[in-house]
């Protein structure tokens, strides 16, 4: 397994560059920005203050939003689901309040948008199973999520809904076979 040779966790994405193993999605995105600055469009703003702002929001997503998403998905008791849903909403409202529209930094699709896009593509799972509604975050969040999910670069890279539909068919088949 080549992934294991590059990433000790055996996860992808993983890249070997000049004999060094590099992995973790957001770290790789920043690496490509640094290693190939002439490739356009850039995912991080050129202004160092705005770059720092982007990194602060990436930290927010990693430390606040993503754990809340997982807690909501994994919660079994109604009380824990409700608490996790409120935590998720709070995290997204904080992010939504800084969106400059149509993308996070305005007209340019950025690394912040890249980082949240897979979770937007997966939020239908929370909607179908945990009562999540984009509009309950805010109208601005709903509009932003709708713009991000139909962006061509996002649509071309996602297989989430097709993966989950196959899983749902498999579960239905298992139930029938019982």
Where are these regions (language model features)?
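Surface-exposed helix-capping loop/turn segments at secondary-structure junctions
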Residues: 97-107, 128-129, 152-157
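GST superfamily/GST-like fold recognition
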Residues: 107-143, 148
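GST-like domain detector, emphasizing the conserved glutathione-binding G-site
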Residues: 1-104, 178
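A contiguous, mid-protein "functional segment" used to position or interact
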Residues: 137-166
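Alpha-helical scaffold segments in carbohydrate-active enzymes
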Residues: 53-56, 60, 91-94, 117-122, ...
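Acidic/histidine-enriched, glycine/proline-rich intrinsically disordered or flexible terminal extensions
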Residues: 160-178
